[in-house]
């Protein structure tokens, strides 16, 4: 399984992605770098698929990754039912251009 290292040790990378996924599911739209957005998309799609399953085991798996219990509740009660007829492709990434300061390519990731 391939993944992006994002210039961080594994524990910092995992913590950063957990924070980004939690914020993405809370606000349904975030601005970040392209590489981070692509990694967030992979994880967020899996979380939404867990939400669509809707059983206790899926809820516990989501709670193990998502940092905030209220976000898990939103995922299972609000977000997942929206996509019950859709098989994947729950997110969309728009490229914004370079970030002022360091020139990193920015992107917006949002729910479809």
From Swiss-Prot:
HAMAP family membership: Ribosomal_bL17 (MF_01368)
Family that this chain belongs to: Belongs to the bacterial ribosomal protein bL17 family.
NCBIfam families reported for this sequence: L17 (TIGR00059)
Name listed for the protein in its UniProt record: Large ribosomal subunit protein bL17
GO cellular component: cytosolic large ribosomal subunit
SUPFAM superfamilies per the UniProt record, alphabetical: Prokaryotic ribosomal protein L17
Domain of life: Bacteria
InterPro entries: Ribosomal_bL17 (IPR000456), Ribosomal_bL17_CS (IPR047859), Ribosomal_bL17_sf (IPR036373)
Example of a GO MF term: structural constituent of ribosome
Gene coding for it: rplQ
KW Ribonucleoprotein (keyword) present: yes
Taxonomic path: Bacteria, Bacillati, Bacillota, Clostridia, Thermoanaerobacterales
UniProt entry keywords in alphabetical sequence: Ribonucleoprotein, Ribosomal protein
Record has Ribonucleoprotein as a keyword: yes
Subunit structure: Part of the 50S ribosomal subunit. Contacts protein L32.
Organism field: Caldanaerobacter subterraneus subsp. tengcongensis (strain DSM 15242 / JCM 11007 / NBRC 100824 / MB4)
Pfam family, one: Ribosomal_L17
